[in-house]
């Protein structure tokens, strides 16, 4: 294994500056040390509470400050969440992610959230939540319920952050990650490419993530999904090669983390997605709608996986059932195109 190092922004920028194929070659070499290059981890994402968020994240259609046409919805009933999780499992997903458009969860919501975690775990799936900021007690309660992962993105560099969000600080985000880690929950944290940031900001974001006391187990790299009504709706498109470079640098700097090809994948053709996998991406969202735009249809994903010879990573949880694991490949091949939800995080 490669010994972990503390990264500087200069070192990260030097990786971004490498010739494209040299960078991909290095990323693929690192990837093969830590992972099976033919395996991809698959998650399904469900918005359990949509819209009316009080924050001002300029990229997000869920903010109550922007007119995006998104209808707000109350916290879903536990039974609805479990039904969606069951469908996701039958379609081949091994991790179920539940997200709520909150600045932070309220005390009245915690019993429902804990029950959701317990019942999804009982299906034999890994669990993930993204609920905004957490205090230490909330993190511990979710950990005690069995939560495997908590997502809380840093979004961009500390220097550029204030151009995008003013309603919570960068330190607020780092503090939440600390509380999650202290509670024994695995960390999922990444960022967004295409906010108007410079290459240096992308490098600085990855340095922040890689230099955490322990790097995130999962690092989602999002391409900005431009939604009409948000302040970033007219941003320039991200050059696919710049996005692929970001995936590759993330893989090199965080070799043991799952690097997730996340929001924006619906904008990518097969060739770009294939290059992202070559650069070290080994996790995706599947069979769902991500944010307010659909991911590629499941059948298109399966066609691409077959073309590339990609297999789905099987995950055994403490409550996992062997039959589901044994028939995972068959289940996903036979999956239909049902959309699990029409929601945003």
From Swiss-Prot:
It catalyses: (4R,5S)-dethiobiotin + (sulfur carrier)-SH + 2 reduced [2Fe-2S]-[ferredoxin] + 2 S-adenosyl-L-methionine = (sulfur carrier)-H + biotin + 2 5'-deoxyadenosine + 2 L-methionine + 2 oxidized [2Fe-2S]-[ferredoxin]. [2Fe-2S] cluster binds at residues 97, 128, 188, 260. Disulfide bonds: none annotated. GO terms for molecular function: 2 iron, 2 sulfur cluster binding; 4 iron, 4 sulfur cluster binding; biotin synthase activity; iron ion binding. [4Fe-4S] cluster binds at residues 53, 57, 60. Coiled coil: none annotated. GO terms for biological process: biotin biosynthetic process. The keyword Ion transport does not apply. PROSITE patterns: RADICAL_SAM (PS51918). Pfam families: BATS (PF06968), Radical_SAM (PF04055). Keywords: 2Fe-2S, 4Fe-4S, Biotin biosynthesis, Iron, Iron-sulfur, Metal-binding, S-adenosyl-L-methionine, Transferase. The keyword Transferase applies. CDD domains: Radical_SAM (cd01335). SUPFAM superfamilies: Radical SAM enzymes (SSF102114). Its EC number is 2.8.1.6. It is an enzyme of class 2 (transferase). Pathway: Cofactor biosynthesis; biotin biosynthesis; biotin from 7,8-diaminononanoate: step 2/2. Residues 38-256 form the Radical SAM core domain. InterPro entries: Aldolase_TIM (IPR013785), BATS_dom (IPR010722), Biotin_synth/BioAB (IPR002684), Biotin_synthase (IPR024177), Elp3/MiaA/NifB-like_rSAM (IPR006638), rSAM (IPR007197). HAMAP family: BioB. Catalyzes the conversion of dethiobiotin (DTB) to biotin by the insertion of a sulfur atom into dethiobiotin via a radical-based mechanism. Homodimer. Belongs to the radical SAM superfamily. Biotin synthase family. This is Biotin synthase. It comes from Photorhabdus laumondii subsp. laumondii (strain DSM 15139 / CIP 105565 / TT01).
């Amino acid at each position: 294994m490669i010994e972990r190092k503390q990264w500087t922004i200069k070192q990260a920028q030097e990786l971004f500056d490498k010739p494209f194929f040299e960078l991909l070659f290095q990323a693929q070499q690192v990837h093969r040390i830590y992972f099976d290059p033919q395996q991809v981890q698959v998650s399904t994402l469900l918005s359990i509470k949509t819209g009316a968020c009080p924050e001002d994240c300029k990229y997000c259609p869920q903010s109550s400050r922007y007119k995006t046409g998104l209808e707000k919805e109350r916290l879903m009933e536990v039974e609805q969440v479990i039904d969606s999780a069951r469908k996701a499992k039958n379609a081949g997903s091994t991790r179920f992610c539940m997200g709520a458009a909150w600045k932070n969860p309220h005390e009245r919501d915690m019993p429902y959230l804990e029950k959701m975690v317990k019942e999804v775990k009982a299906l034999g799936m890994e669990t993930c939540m993204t609920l905004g900021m957490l205090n230490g007690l909330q993190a511990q309660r979710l950990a005690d319920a069995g939560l495997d992962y908590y997502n809380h993105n840093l979004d961009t560099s500390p220097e550029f952050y204030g151009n995008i969000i003013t309603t919570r600080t960068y330190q607020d985000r780092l503090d939440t990650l600390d509380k999650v880690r202290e509670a024994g929950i695995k960390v999922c944290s990444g960022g967004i490419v295409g906010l108007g940031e410079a290459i240096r900001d992308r490098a600085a974001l990855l340095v922040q993530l890689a230099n955490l006391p322990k790097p995130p187990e999962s690092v989602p790299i999002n391409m900005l999904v431009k939604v009409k009504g948000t302040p970033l709706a007219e941003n320039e498109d991200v050059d696919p090669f710049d996005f692929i470079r970001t995936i590759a640098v993330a893989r090199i700097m965080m070799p043991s983390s799952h690097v997730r090809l996340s929001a924006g994948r619906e904008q990518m053709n097969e060739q770009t997605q294939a290059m992202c996998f070559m650069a070290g991406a080994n996790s995706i969202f599947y069979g769902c709608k991500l944010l307010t735009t659909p991911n590629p249809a499941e059948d298109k994903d399966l066609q691409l996986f077959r073309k590339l010879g990609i297999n789905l990573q099987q995950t055994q949880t403490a409550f996992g059932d062997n039959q589901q694991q044994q028939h995972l490949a068959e289940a996903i091949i036979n999956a239909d195109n049902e959309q699990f939800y029409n929601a945003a995080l």
